Amino acid sequence: MELKEGKKNDYRRKLGEIWPELTAFLDQEKVHNFSIWNCDSLIFGYYETDENHEFSEEKKNQIQALTAKIEDTFTWISTPGENMRLMYHNFGVVRENKELIRHRMFMTKLKPGCEEEYKARHDGLVAAREGKIDPGPDSNFSIWSAGGY
């Protein structure tokens, strides 16, 4: 999402207003590792579900109703409800203590027409690892694409 000019405080206030309803929904649907972060006026959200989880039409309608309460503060830069595309991964050591994991986020905007080349190059890096687990501190690293970012 991209915040509309001058709407950052409105977005934060409205998100706070729907937060109890949103977190209750996430708990009910067994959504975990939910996070929201921003880079300037861009807002990204992330969550995980069990592998074969799909939201029912009723649940999708609930999501749309919650979104409608804050939608006047942003425009979509990706397709609502569509998963981000995994561009690269190095999922390595599963850490018992999640507090030790470094959480970092960076963002870049791909030049038009470069997404497939970017993906192909990173697929080559994944193939070169030949399935070996990286024990280093930066394992469990992934790159996702949402709306060209």
Predicted regions and their residues:
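Intrinsically disordered, low-complexity acidic/polar segments
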Residues: 8, 45, 54-55
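Intrinsically disordered, low-complexity linker/propeptide segments enriched in Ser/Thr/Gly/Pro
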Residues: 1, 11-14, 141-143, 149
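An amphipathic, aromatic/His-enriched active-site/gating alpha helix that lines ligand/cofactor pockets
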Residues: 25-32, 49-83, 134-138
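Glycine-rich beta-strand-turn "strand-cap" elements at beta-sheet edges
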Residues: 34-41, 64-101, 144-147
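Short glycine-/aliphatic-rich beta-strand segments at the starts of folded cytosolic domains
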Residues: 1-12, 100-116
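Short amphipathic alpha-helical segments
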Residues: 7-29, 114-137
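Short, glycine- and small/hydrophobic-rich beta-strand elements in well-ordered beta-sheets
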Residues: 23-49, 130-149
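Long, contiguous hydrophobic alpha-helical segments, chiefly transmembrane helices and signal peptides
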Residues: 43-45, 106-110, 118, 122
